[in-house]
């Protein structure tokens, strides 16, 4: 089998040296992706296309599908490469290939020709088209908007019968641009923004800020692995997980409620910039869209950018949510995003939309920056190829209960402000307060002879924290959902 790879048009308008470099990189990317399907596969580059030849017919569909997901490819032609003697021979081969496909259809013939021949491309179109029209009674020629377009390519003494055309994702080959670090949360925005930078030729590494709980990290790892495996598997990338729970705890205790969102984002940018500098990455990528939430106003984004010299790319800055969700659906991350928990432990009740720099800096003076340095130093760096094996390990499920027994105690893990606004009172059972950001250090001090029923407003935080505690060896935890 043979495939002809057509280049993304922006590649073809580059200077000769740049075009050759892009084609060379794309050829290497194709080899890296397809070698898993057929080790005997051959990839040959030309000035205006790339040929892929493989022997294992059983892998035809898999190879074709993989090619449509490699950045830099405009479209793929699946062809049958045969010799020919003259124009009538071209017609006979086209008739044998397309007879069944043209029954009862309108059609036209389009020919591309390279090399020296006694005929022109238009002459071949007329001869083959007329012959097909005569020999297939139910077929009819229609030059504009036909049901079927018969594509033929003539190159020297070879005829390429095009059996199918399949659209690629376009863009530039990965590796033609410099590396970036995507701040991935597993939601709609960060997945789409990561894809857009891969499509533009960047090798995308991933940085995840874990706000508490293994289940959330496993979910985000699966999203990152899916994006890499589907669109970027030609290159090795990193997945860096930073335990941001201590930072969140410090913010909740030391920072004014209205400034929390902006301060948290500034801390994330500081941490990600340190990671980027460590690995020689040139830019950060976020899924922020203008005005989508309170921290994404121009004033707040400017304040967030000011904490680092690292370039921050926001490919979705002018996109609305509906457009982003449609893109997530197209690339296959929608289902991941819909089931990803909305982790909102640091959402202010009255967040500022126009933060003042002096006020933000004054709030940050209360913050212990050694905590930030420590979590970055202890960040977990994983080769993304190892994630598939790690995520196959079962996550311990935690029992969810709606009632309680004589030995049960409800543990309210909401932030202090939330508890003050809406105190939890349940008849017939004790209620103890311990904010989620203190669980990792304070839960062990509680009476371990009791069964602790973790509770929060939405049930997401309580489940994540219960999973975390189970991983730490505490079996006496459940989730309370009345």
Curated annotation (Swiss-Prot):
Catalytic reaction equation(s): [ThiI sulfur-carrier protein]-S-sulfanyl-L-cysteine + a uridine in tRNA + 2 reduced [2Fe-2S]-[ferredoxin] + ATP + H(+) = [ThiI sulfur-carrier protein]-L-cysteine + a 4-thiouridine in tRNA + 2 oxidized [2Fe-2S]-[ferredoxin] + AMP + diphosphate; [ThiS sulfur-carrier protein]-C-terminal Gly-Gly-AMP + S-sulfanyl-L-cysteinyl-[cysteine desulfurase] + AH2 = [ThiS sulfur-carrier protein]-C-terminal-Gly-aminoethanethioate + L-cysteinyl-[cysteine desulfurase] + A + AMP + 2 H(+)
Recorded superkingdom: Bacteria
Binding, ATP: 183-184, 265, 287, 296
GO BP term, example: thiazole biosynthetic process
Disulfide bonds: 344-456
Active site feature: 456
Subcellular location(s) of the protein: Cytoplasm
Matching CDD domains: PPase_ThiI (cd01712), RHOD (cd00158), THUMP_ThiI (cd11716)
Function text: Catalyzes the ATP-dependent transfer of a sulfur to tRNA to produce 4-thiouridine in position 8 of tRNAs, which functions as a near-UV photosensor. Also catalyzes the transfer of sulfur to the sulfur carrier protein ThiS, forming ThiS-thiocarboxylate. This is a step in the synthesis of thiazole, in the thiamine biosynthesis pathway. The sulfur is donated as persulfide by IscS.
Name the record gives this protein: tRNA sulfurtransferase
């Amino acid at each position: 089998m043979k495939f002809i790879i057509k280049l993304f048009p922006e590649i073809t308008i580059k200077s000769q040296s740049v075009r050759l470099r892009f084609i060379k990189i794309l050829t290497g990317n194709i080899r890296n992706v397809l070698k898993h399907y057929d080790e005997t596969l051959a990839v040959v580059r030309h000035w205006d296309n790339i040929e892929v030849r493989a022997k294992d017919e059983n892998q035809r569909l898999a190879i074709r599908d993989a090619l449509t997901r490699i950045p830099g490819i405009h479209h793929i032609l699946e062809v049958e490469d045969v010799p020919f003697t003259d124009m009538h021979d071209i017609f006979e081969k086209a008739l044998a290939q397309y007879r069944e496909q043209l029954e009862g259809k309108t059609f036209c013939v389009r020919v591309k020709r390279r090399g020296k021949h006694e005929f022109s491309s238009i002459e071949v179109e007329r001869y083959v088209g007329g012959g097909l029209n005569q020999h297939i009674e139910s077929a009819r020629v229609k030059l504009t908007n036909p049901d079927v377009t018969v594509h033929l390519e003539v190159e020297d003494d070879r005829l390429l019968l095009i059996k199918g055309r399949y659209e690629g994702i376009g863009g530039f080959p990965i590796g033609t641009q410099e590396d970036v670090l995507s701040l991935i949360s597993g939601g709609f925005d960060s997945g789409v923004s990561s894809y857009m930078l891969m499509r533009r030729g960047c090798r995308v590494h991933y940085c995840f800020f874990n706000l508490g709980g293994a289940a959330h990290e496993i979910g985000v790892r699966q999203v990152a692995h899916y994006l890499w495996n589907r669109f970027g598997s030609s290159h090795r990338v990193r997945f860096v997980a930073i335990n941001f729970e201590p930072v969140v705890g410090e913010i909740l205790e030391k920072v004014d409620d209205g400034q929390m969102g902006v301060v948290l984002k500034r801390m994330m940018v500081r941490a990600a910039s340190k990671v980027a500098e460590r690995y020689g990455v040139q830019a950060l990528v976020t899924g922020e869209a203008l005005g989508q939430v309170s921290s994404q106003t121009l004033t707040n984004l400017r304040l967030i950018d000011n904490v680092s010299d690292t370039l921050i790319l926001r490919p979705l800055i002018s996109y609305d949510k509906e457009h982003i969700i449609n893109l997530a659906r197209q690339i296959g991350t929608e289902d991941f995003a819909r089931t990803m928990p909305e982790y909102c432990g640091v959402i202010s009740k009255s967040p500022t939309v126009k933060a003042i720099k002096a006020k933000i800096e004054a709030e940050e003076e209360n913050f212990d920056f050694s905590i930030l340095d420590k979590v970055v130093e202890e960040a977990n760096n994983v080769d993304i190829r190892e994630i598939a094996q790690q995520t196959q390990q079962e996550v311990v499920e935690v029992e969810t209960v709606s009632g309680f027994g004589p030995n049960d105690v409800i543990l309210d893990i909401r932030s202090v402000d939330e508890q003050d606004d809406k105190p939890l009172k349940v008849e017939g059972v004790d209620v103890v307060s311990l904010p989620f950001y203190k669980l990792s250090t304070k839960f062990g001090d509680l009476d371990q002879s009791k069964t602790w029923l973790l509770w929060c407003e939405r049930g997401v935080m309580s489940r994540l924290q219960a999973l975390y505690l189970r991983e730490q060896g505490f079996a006496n935890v459940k989730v309370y959902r009345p």
